[in-house]
């Protein structure tokens, strides 16, 4: 078992912990958590999740430690990752989930503290590799020390972009993610650097920015500069959907597009990552779904063979958290 620590016990940090602890075959052992929150509060928030339900086992705190089903996990409250006791706990991979240390230099503080590798749960600057599991995780090597797991939206978009670029080619495309609100927004109107995110999250549809489409170019260099997009935050707490429209390099049909996506979901590196859906579902149906991307085949459209539209759902919390675990597992195998 490879020992890992989580820095930041917020929405993603807690769900990464749930994913590790609920997947005994993942090869990872969670030995430490760093978070500035109170131990009792963290225990309660881990056990009782408004979106994903209760943890089925026992959760408590003792001193500063978290105890889950009898397993004791050391908890610290350090602001600077360089001061974390990674060496003392034998931590090999630091899972950086605060959302603050999102460049190679700042994330590298985990290495200074004794970790061997760092996986960042967000897009990051200057890192050794940006990974979307199922698309380019096979590019990971032992030389990649600080890695980004991209964003939840890039993890949804990249698999379908990969399949369709291989099958029919993508000349250029635009994506819109209709995205559930997140903690970056305000419950009621309040100052925020983005004046649209400053508005009450549960009362409006809120247009905002996303770099998810452009980030596909970091994962698939052949698509660099060919995709862009935007986001609309909506008043739901979880589950989002990517709406991709693109011009193919050759004429195609709806059946060909769906056939390519269906085949990729059934075998190869995207099996278990990409899901092909034939039922008329809605967002709540994907709450708790581990797939990165669930193609809504009923929504696929092709206009005159020259314009393609694809819709794909994703649990922006649970799916992404499981990809953190999957990518960390690949990194562990390279240590």
Labelled PLM ranges:
Residues 1-198, 326, 334-335:
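N-terminal Rossmann-like NAD(P) cofactor-binding subdomain of oxidoreductases
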Residues 1, 143-144, 200-202, 239-243, ...:
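Short, solvent-exposed beta-strand edge segments and adjacent coil->beta transition regions
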């Amino acid at each position: 078992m490879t020992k890992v620590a989580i820095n930041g016990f917020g929405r993603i940090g807690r769900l990464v912990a749930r994913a590790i602890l609920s997947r005994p075959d993942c090869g990872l052992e969670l030995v430490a958590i760093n978070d500035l929150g109170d131990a009792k509060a963290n225990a309660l928030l881990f056990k009782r999740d408004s979106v994903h339900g209760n943890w089925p086992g026992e959760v408590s705190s003792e001193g500063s430690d978290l105890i889950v089903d009898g397993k004791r996990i050391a908890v610290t409250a350090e602001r600077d990752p360089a001061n974390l006791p990674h060496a003392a706990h034998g931590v090999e991979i630091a899972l950086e989930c605060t959302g603050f240390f999102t460049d190679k230099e700042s994330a590298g503080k985990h290495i200074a503290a004794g970790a061997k590798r760092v996986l960042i749960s967000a897009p990051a600057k200057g890192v050794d590799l940006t990974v979307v599991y199922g698309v380019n995780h096979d590019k990971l090597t032992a030389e990649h020390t600080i890695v980004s797991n991209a964003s939840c939206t890039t993890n949804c978009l990249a698999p379908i972009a990969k399949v369709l670029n291989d099958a029919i080619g993508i000349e250029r495309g635009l994506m819109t993610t209709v995205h559930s609100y997140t903690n970056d927004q305000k419950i009621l109107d309040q100052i925020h650097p983005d004046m649209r995110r400053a508005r009450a999250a549960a009362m409006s549809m809120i247009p905002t920015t996303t770099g998810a489409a452009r980030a596909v170019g970091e994962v698939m260099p052949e698509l660099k500069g060919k995709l862009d997009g935007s986001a609309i935050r909506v008043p739901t707490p979880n589950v989002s959907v990517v709406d991709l429209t693109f011009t193919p390099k050759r004429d195609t049909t709806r059946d060909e597009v769906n056939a390519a996506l269906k085949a990729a979901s059934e075998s190869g590196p995207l099996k278990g990552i990409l899901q092909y859906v034939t039922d008329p579902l809605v967002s709540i149906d994907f709450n708790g779904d581990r797939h990165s991307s669930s193609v809504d085949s009923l929504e696929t459209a092709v206009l005159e063979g020259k314009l393609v539209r694809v819709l794909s759902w994703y649990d922006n919390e649970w799916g992404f958290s499981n990809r953190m675990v999957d990518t960390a597992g690949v990194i562990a195998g390279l240590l």
